[in-house]
Amino acid sequence: MDHVKLVNDPIDIAHIHQLLADEGCGASSVFVGTTRDNFQGKKVLSLAYEAYDSMALKEMNKICSDLRSKWLDLKHIVIYHRLGTVPVCQASVVIAASSPHRSEALESVSFAIDQLKTRVPIWKKEIYEGDNDSEWKENKESIRPKKSKSGFNYAACPCKVEESHDVPRTLVQIRVNDAELAKRLECFVNRKRDEINSQNVIDFKSSFVSSDKDLSDSCARTQSTIIKQEQSNCHLKVRRVNNRCGPQQMEMRPNYELELNKLMGSRDGQTDPTKEMRKSLPNSRLQAIESYMGLTTDNEENIFSRIKRVENRLLQLESISPEYRHFTKREPSSMEAAPPKKIRKKSYSAQELSAFIQKVKDGSEFS
């Protein structure tokens, strides 16, 4: 069993031994980290520990899982860390493990100590005696990235400015004194703050409030009404729309086009655009196209403008749905000439060619 805890009181070592006790275990290894009274010649009075509790517990549980994956015979694992002020000689951390054999217990505890120092977000502050200031200690074993040593050191390269040098007025964008500049900055910050507050009211505050209440001092923090949506990390409500018809069904319904063809097949013979075209005036062909496209017909309008509107309508229909094809079926025109038929040339044998040549020589072919 895993026992992971962050405590603010002194750690009871006897209680740790009770957690490790098991009839099937022949070895228990316990590490106790305590506060020492000196550091580099300075007298240490105590240590102060702070932690990111939720993340620290999560990492400590991960360490327990890693231990069990490496040493399968481990029975009980204990990781206790104390927070707050820890005086000299008192325990700040206890790591213990029990197993049937001593090798697994010793190796697992040693591994857990190194992982705790490397991965768990716990910070230590040393409090010294006398005039020495307290100091937060850097964890040199941490795997978190540190500042790059190759970064540019601006302090080592000070910029010298000659006060006597006059800057051209063309290079100065703002020509006001410090008071006016501070006033402008304050106005800008206040305006951005008002914009954020108004947006928070729109996103978070309830619109169903009584008009008799004074809401001049209200804000989203005190009167927030939005409830977090289930299975979502967003506070705004999200809806999923499933279109039962249209081009989006092409992927979800493989037979959509076939079903559409069957459904619209009965309507194909209801109207015959060619009959109307033959009966109407010379521009009747364009009028028929406009009627099928759902466009209003104006005979006084320029014909090129009407054709342009028809083209735009076709592009729109092509972009939104394939159904338009059933309303604009192209029929072959009776005025179009039929394509020429292919004529297969006759093949002659050698005897037929010889007879034909002989007839030409005799002149009987032309007589």
Curated annotation (Swiss-Prot):
Q: Which GO terms describe its molecular function?
A: molybdopterin synthase activity
Q: Does the keyword Transferase apply?
A: yes
Q: Which UniProt keywords apply?
A: Cytoplasm, Molybdenum cofactor biosynthesis, Transferase
* Main localisation: cytoplasm
Q: Where is this region: Disordered?
A: 326-345
> Which HAMAP family does UniProt cross-reference here?
MOC2B
Subunit structure, interactors included: Heterotetramer; composed of 2 small (Mocs2A) and 2 large (Mocs2B) subunits.
Q: What family is it from?
A: Belongs to the MoaE family. MOCS2B subfamily.
| UniProt-recorded name of the protein | Molybdopterin synthase catalytic subunit
The species this protein was found in? Drosophila sechellia (Fruit fly)
Instruction: Provide the taxonomic classification.
Output: Eukaryota, Metazoa, Ecdysozoa, Arthropoda, Hexapoda
